[in-house]
Amino acid sequence: MYSTEKVLKDFRDVPLKEREKAIGSELVEREMLSKLPPLMRNMFVDAFLNPAREEQIKTDERTIMLKIFFAQLNISAVANHIITHKPSSHKALEALYNKSPVMFVDRYFYDCRAGDAIPDRLNAVVENVPHLIRKIGEEKAFIKVLIPGSGSAQDIIRILVNNPDIRHKTVVRCIDDELSAIKLGRKMAKKAGVSDNVVYVKDDLMRLDYQDTDLVLLVGIICPLPNIVSIKVVKKVVSYCRKGALVVFSAALQKMLIEDPVTCFIMDIAGWRLNYKTKKEVEEIAKKSGLAPRGSFQDPKNKYHQIIIGEVI
């Protein structure tokens, strides 16, 4: 194995031996390759082992045909949501969270390491954030939580349901630019009995007018962004906070790319391209955004995400 501090942009940077090992895994064969028509199977393997250069992706016939194939809803609900809706859409994340529905090749996405890391990251947030809210609550009668790019906000809904002692003093503002996410979130919050605590607003996370937030959850938002843009986004979120507030943000690590390059390859085809970072880079993003380190945690199974806790200084 090689250092995770080496700069790796995408699956092409993973050594050929590692890619050959990955494409030959039992899971890839059972839940992906064996289900593909012969032509698609051959294209899939060839495009993974002998990829087009980055500047040729848009015109590479294999990539184009594979994208058209995976865009079919009866083939994959996950890939369909990414391709036909938008990359990083809440619809794809909801499917990964719930491991449903199961179309032709979706079992692969739900069982692969990178796919399983998404609900595992959600569970890690649900497990680690309540004590932060309690800590803030020691000094404040009400805690104002902001979730930019919230999607349905499954994380905060579960946190409030699982921790009734903090529910009565927690007010949450969920911001998303997808109306479908807003509608789903409101429905889920109402069903869970926490709709009085959670307000959903359709808006742009970069154009908010808040200055008094106590806690921000920015989960999954900077994963596709270059470091310089990630800093800009986290800085903007910091501006919505009071001094001493806590910001929790996550970033996908290069470990995901190294250990599951096949899934990262499929994500590239679908247009959901992540910017895989090192732990050092994630820490630097926090520092340059005006945050003092106050801890971190990860998705426990595979540790594919670094989740930083920073204090606004």
Mark where each language-model region is.
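Class I (Rossmann-like) S-adenosyl-L-methionine-dependent methyltransferase catalytic domain
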Residues: 2-65, 109-133, 140-143, 153-171, ...
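N-terminal, positively charged/glycine-rich alpha-helical extensions of SAM-dependent methyltransferases
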Residues: 58-108
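A generic alpha-to-beta junction signature in SAM-dependent methyltransferases
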Residues: 136-137, 241
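Class I SAM-dependent methyltransferase core
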Residues: 147
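A short acidic, Gly/Pro-enriched loop at the edge of an enzyme's catalytic core
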Residues: 206-216
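A short beta-strand submotif of the Rossmann-like class I SAM-dependent methyltransferase core
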Residues: 217-221
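A short, conserved alpha-helix within the catalytic core of class I
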Residues: 224-237
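Conserved helix-to-beta-strand junction in the class I
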Residues: 236-243, 289
